[in-house]
UniProtKB/Swiss-Prot annotation:
PROSITE patterns: USP_3. This is PAN2-PAN3 deadenylation complex catalytic subunit pan2. Belongs to the peptidase C19 family. PAN2 subfamily. Contains a pseudo-UCH domain. This ubiquitin C-terminal hydrolase (UCH)-like or ubiquitin specific protease (USP)-like domain is predicted to be catalytically inactive because it lacks the active site catalytic triad characteristic of thiol proteases, with residues at the equivalent structural positions that are incompatible with catalysis, and it cannot bind ubiquitin. It functions as a structural scaffold for intra- and intermolecular interactions in the complex. Residues 1091-1106 have a biased composition (Polar residues). Keywords: Cytoplasm, Exonuclease, Hydrolase, Metal-binding, mRNA processing, Nuclease, Repeat, WD repeat. Residues 447-816 form the USP domain. It comes from the Eukaryota. Binds 2 metal cations per subunit in the catalytic exonuclease domain. It is an enzyme of class 3 (hydrolase). It comes from Aspergillus niger (strain ATCC MYA-4892 / CBS 513.88 / FGSC A1513). It catalyses: Exonucleolytic cleavage of poly(A) to 5'-AMP. Its cofactor is a divalent metal cation. Residues 310-446 are annotated as: Linker.
Length: 1150
């Protein structure tokens, strides 16, 4: 090893497939013909390790054990097969044999066209490389793990011995006990053999030997070993220097030593955490290291690194010629592009009389038959269910082209246009929609699976507000929208919401002082409050799912939607259930570390005893669990109906206690022993969450038994053991008032719906909404929640599992005493500290006009506040352009809240903002839309922003507090703002000037910019000279507040309709836009009246000096304005500044 040897390159090992996670390379080797390094049947070219070829030679479940090279190609070995490819990746042959069960190693024999393969099995095979066939099968008594060819064929066994085999008949010539436990690596060249391995020290676990053993193959005798204190794990002999070897440890220490002179050593340290193997190039100038972090390191001298002395030139793919440059602008006619030159008839001109339909798709196997399939000589067979007539053939081609049964309803805008049609046509349309609604509600038998179909939101040019959600939901319970990342959890969130104890804890926690940005329990409280306030309107869990997506632990567990390609939805939602419950328990303790209220409600308190079966030593540790997985016994389905061991209550008891025997570490024996694990239960929770863990098709037959899942179970704890009862047994014990008996009600369950025909698997929930009702109900009411499709179902339908497409996943039971326990005292215990103090991430100063609320200004029910928000684009809309040129919005643009401004709506400081927060955004921002939002790059970056930056959680909580304090929000276009903020505000707490100034006979909504000019003759939201300016949310909120005040004056005067007529008449002339500033504006007073506006500054909005002067001359107490109900006086064209009592002076009604 020269002095300049160092790491030349490091590359990650490519993943085994496109969507798989990276894994380690189990074998690496240098090619002796080309400048290639091979690993996982992938080759890398040259010192830069440029990827050359990659093939899948063996099944994904079989790791590559060894790679050797021949002039004709590359030979790889897996546990059950041998494969040969050319260096360009073409397969030459593949050999598998029934007695190839655990192949470990291979080597060339005395004949260069033959190899011998062996392993931990009783047979060895010799293979002809040229023909790709097995020549001979040899019986052996040894299990071989490594083979190296030199003077003899050196083979290491799994017991730590090394056998020297004859190259002619493979008989054992000499055997050495090289290591105590196993041989980890060895190499043989010329007359020397060097081995590395493991031994057991003092009855402990095997450790790496600190010596590398050396043997002379000429005399078949051992030589002095090589000392290596770091632990000799890997070894390679130098191809040129016959007595020089490379020895490496598992921690990355490299030692180059002369076997004849062990004192002459050269040390290096590789930057690896754990080494898995090394290989030396045939030239001796390059060393490859394979580590446990899925990387390959190349060491060598930068000046003269070559893999071989004389290498063949590697062949690379031809560079595809670049296509000619064409003018493909929208203005270019398609005829200018032209067609390629051809001299014969094109295949596309195939005559119609030669088109035939052949090869229809095979009929799909009935899913109900899968549990009954039995293997046969060719395929599988099952009893005929006799669902069709004899010789009846299924038209699979028609089924393949069939459309889904559930078709989206018409857009609301389309329905509004159709109202102008003839009454007869309208009646037909209404009847068709009523029939479709009847199908969804399950009142027809045409398609009973209709309500279980996938539901998707369709978008028109008016956005999501134009979608008819009421078509899917006629109940008072709100559904959750899709098209949000990780929205597959909607069904589980609905289940949590209808569990009273979880709902109460979440809302009380949300009302506390918690402002942790990633608190999942707070987000659940906000979501549950939103669902209750919505009363049947559609909602979305955007903020909660964004918080869920931010957890690195959830990403590592593969719980996100993008990780579900190779994972069933049922397994995923059960893992999410465990994560959610564990995370909300953690979040609860962040605010109340000394309280065990949540554990009392959710945790099964138990202790787990672990007893060694050898020494009988027993240890006890806590065994609390938030989720219990059902553990099914070995089932004889014929006795399932009669055997009480297969009842749900008995399976539940065995699942909670969960006795098992496994191998585990015994501290007394200091080794792994067979241990017995037993759980003793001390307290059951008030909410019993269960994962169905239904992976065995045989166990699914238990669920198919009618009434197998009980609505009620009773549990008694006696001496650390539990007793479970159901059905008549439970009724008898309830009547006898059994001591300690706790009865649980089934609140609901989450199910996976997997209908193969044109449907993708999705999740729904069945919930008994009567348990969470505020008024006691005599009858249980079950509802289906399929995202935003909500409908009532029968109890029998909810608890029926005899169809293979309905798979139970998560169950929730709650103590019967918790029925109707809806606690709303959190509204009286709101922690409003956040409203009365400044909070900033970056120490930025808010606008000077902002004044934080004082304690005397604490909002009360009915307090008006003006609101305006600004947003930035996080994702652009996804638009599908069809062949006819029409466009369909597949997914709308995604916005992020960037600024929130809230102003006082009454009092001496009326119009003064008390909230003006900029929100930091961690996602990628694709467009700041500065001309509309006023947000510029850097405004939301805590490192450079000069504004008051807060997390989304803080800004949202301020709005949520104002909502639950009873404030009335005044603004323009509030519905869009509330939707993007993801908050639900009742209509009784909303004043939207967009609807106040709405003419019933005019199908048009007026912009805030036009209303400001039409009512006050003021210009706002003007187009800036450059893109660095934009809307001001404080200005917009203040204008909406003034418009509301003015509208109330119009109402008192009884002239609303006349004012609206004049506003719309004037707007139709101007295109509903303010006229240019250089024109002569007129003041709206009453129909037919106009007054010229005078302003010395030349602007219709007052200058800064005018505002300051008006504010300075304002009296200490606001003037008491009076209203004239009949006579109107013109405006004087001026107004006082915000925060003064005369802020709305200049009204024609003052």
């Amino acid at each position: 090893m020269e002095a300049d040897w160092d790491e030349l390159s490091r590359i990650p090992v490519p993943a085994p497939s496109v969507h798989a996670l990276p894994t380690i390379a189990t074998a690496i080797a240098f090619d002796d013909v080309m400048e290639l390094l091979w690993g996982r049947i992938t080759s890398f070219f040259g010192p830069e390790l440029q990827r050359y070829t990659s093939v899948r030679a063996h099944p994904a479940t079989e790791p590559v054990r060894q790679i050797i090279f021949h002039d004709r190609g590359v030979i790889s070995l897996s546990p059950k097969s041998v494969h040969m490819i050319t260096r360009r990746g073409l397969t030459q042959w593949h050999i598998a044999h029934e007695e190839m069960t655990d192949l470990r190693c291979m080597s060339f024999t005395a004949q260069t066209n033959r190899i011998i393969v062996a392993g931990c099995q009783k047979s060895m095979f010799t293979i002809d490389i040229d023909k790709g066939i097995i020549i001979d099968k040899l019986h052996t008594e040894y299990n071989y793990t490594i083979m190296k060819k030199s003077r003899y064929l050196c083979a290491a066994t799994d017991t730590g011995s090394v056998n020297a085999l004859s190259l002619n008949d493979f008989s054992v010539v000499k055997s050495w006990k090289a290591h105590g436990t196993a041989v980890n690596d060895m190499d043989a060249r010329n007359d020397l053999l060097v081995t590395c391995g493991f031994s057991v020290r003092h009855l402990g676990s095997p450790i790496v030997d600190p010596l590398a053993n050396v043997y002379d193959l000429k005399t078949l005798s051992p030589l002095p070993p090589i000392p290596f204190h770091a632990g000799a794990a890997y070894v390679r002999m130098h191809p040129k220097l016959h007595t020089t070897s490379f020895v490496a440890s598992q921690t990355g220490q490299l030692q180059v030593v002369d076997l004849m002179n062990p004192n002459a050593i050269n040390l290096r340290q590789a930057n690896v955490s754990f080494m898995l193997g090394i290989d030396l190039s045939p030239s001796g100038e390059a060393l490859a290291i394979n580590d446990a972090e899925c990387a390959i390191h190349l060491w060598g001298s930068p000046a003269k690194v070559h893999f071989n002395e004389m290498s063949k030139e590697a062949e690379f793919g031809d560079v595809a010629p670049r296509p000619p440059t064409l003018d493909w602008s929208p203005e270019t006619p398609l005829s200018m592009i032209g067609m390629p030159y051809y001299h014969e008839r094109l295949f596309s001109a195939w005559p119609s009389h030669l088109v035939f339909e052949v090869g229809s798709p095979p009929p799909q196997v009935d899913q109900a038959l899968i549990p009954y399939l039995r293997p046969a000589e060719l395929g599988h067979h099952a009893p005929n269910p006799k669902k069709t007539r004899r010789y009846q053939v299924e038209n699979t081609r028609a089924l393949a082209s069939a459309e889904p049964a559930l078709i989206a309803p018409k857009f609301l805008s389309e329905k509004a246009r159709e109202q102008n049609k003839a009454k007869s046509e309208g009646a037909i349309s209404d009847a068709a929609e009523a029939l479709a609604g009847a199908k969804i509600n399950g009142e027809t038998d045409d398609d009973p699976l209709l309500k279980y179909s996938n539901v998707e939101i369709k978008y028109s040019r008016f956005g999501v507000d134009d979608f008819d959600f009421r078509f899917y939901n006629q109940t008072t319970f709100s559904g959750l929208e899709t098209h949000i990342a990780n929205s597959f959890t909607n069904a589980l969130l609905q289940l949590f919401k209808f569990i009273p104890y979880i709902r109460n804890v979440a809302l009380h926690h949300a009302a506390s002082s918690c402002i942790f940005e990633t608190c999942l329990l707070c987000e659940m409280g906000y979501l549950f409050d939103m669902l209750e306030k919505a009363s049947g309107q559609n909602c979305q869990a955007t903020n909660l799912l964004k918080t869920f997506s931010s957890y690195r632990e959830a990403s590592n567990l593969g719980l996100f939607e993008e990780n579900l390609t190779n994972k069933s939805l049922s397994a995923a939602i059960q893992a999410v259930n465990r994560f959610f419950l564990g995370q909300i328990s953690h979040d609860f303790r962040m605010i109340s570390p000394s309280s065990d209220d949540l554990d009392h409600r959710l945790a099964t308190v138990a202790s787990e005893s672990i007893r060694c079966m050898f020494c009988q030593n027993e240890i006890v540790r806590p065994g609390n669990s938030l989720v219990n997985e059902l553990n099914y016994p070995a089932i004889d389905i014929k006795q399932a109906r009669r055997n009480p061991a297969f009842r749900f209550s008995n399976i539940l008891r065995a699942s909670i206690e969960r006795e098992a025997q496994n191998r585990g570490w015994c501290n007394y024996c200091r080794r792994y022993q067979q241990v017995a694990i037993r759980k003793s239960v001390h307290r059951m929770p008030q909410v019993l969450m269960l994962n169905a863990a239904l992976t065995n098709p045989i166990c699914r037959r238990l669920w198919a038994i009618p009434g197998w899942l009980p609505e009620e179970v009773g549990i008694v704890i006696e001496g650390g053991q539990i007793l479970c009862f159901e059905g008549e047994d439970l009724k008898l014990r309830v009547q006898a008032k059994m001591p300690g008996l706790v009865v649980y009600d089934l609140v609901g369950l989450v199910c996976e719906i997997d209908i193969p025909e044109h449907q993708k698997a999705h999740l729904v929930s069945f919930i008994n909404v009567s348990i969470s009702s505020r008024e006691p109900e005599t009858k249980n009411k079950w509802h289906l929640f399929n995202d935003f499709l909500v409908t009532e179902v029968d109890k029998e339908e909810a608890l029926r599992f005899n169809q293979p497409w309905k798979i139970p996943c998560v169950l929730a039971y709650q103590v019967q005493d918790g029925r109707h326990a809806m606690d709303d005292t959190w509204k009286d215990a709101l922690d409003t500290t956040l409203l009365f103090r400044d909070w900033s991430l970056n120490g930025g100063r808010p606008v000077e006009s902002r004044v934080t609320l004082s304690e005397e200004e604490k909002p009360t029910p009915g307090t008006p506040v003006a609101l305006d928000t600004e947003f930035v684009d996080l994702e652009k809309a996804e638009i599908d352009v069809k062949a006819d040129g029409s466009q369909e919005i597949v997914r709308p643009s995604k916005s992020g809240l960037a600024r929130v401004s809230v102003l006082r709506g009454s009092g001496i400081r009326e119009g003064v903002p008390f909230i003006d927060d900029y929100i930091t955004i961690k996602e990628n921002i694709v467009d700041y839309v500065t001309q509309y939002s006023g947000i510029k790059p850097g405004d939301l970056d805590p490192r450079v922003s000069q504004h008051n930056l807060v997390p989304l959680k803080v800004a949202y909580k301020k709005l949520w507090l104002l909502l639950n304090l009873g404030c009335v929000f005044v603004g323009h276009g509030l519905a869009s703002d509330f939707r993007k903020v993801n908050i639900q505000v009742p209509k009784s707490q909303t004043v939207d000037t967009q609807y106040l100034f709405f003419h019933p006979g005019k199908n048009r909504r007026l912009s805030l910019r036009y209303l400001a000019w039409a009512v006050f003759k003021e210009y706002i939201q003007e187009e800036p000279a450059d893109d660095s300016q934009g809307h001001d949310s404080i200005e917009d909120a203040r204008m909406a507040l003034r418009l509301w005040k003015k509208f109330k004056e119009y109402e008192d005067a009884g002239i609303v309709s006349q004012i609206l007529e004049e506003i719309f008449r004037e707007g139709s002339k101007l295109g509903f836009r303010p006229p240019p500033r250089n024109g002569v504006p007129t003041v709206l007073s009453r129909p037919g009246t106009a007054v010229t506006m005078q302003n010395n500054s030349g602007r219709n909005t007052p200058s800064t000096s005018d505002v300051a002067g008006a504010a300075a001359s304002a009296p200490a107490t606001p003037r008491q304005a009076f209203r004239r109900s009949i006579a109107l006086t013109p405006s004087n064209g001026s107004f006082a500044g915000p925060g003064t009592g005369d802020f709305f002076s200049g009204s024609p009604l003052k």
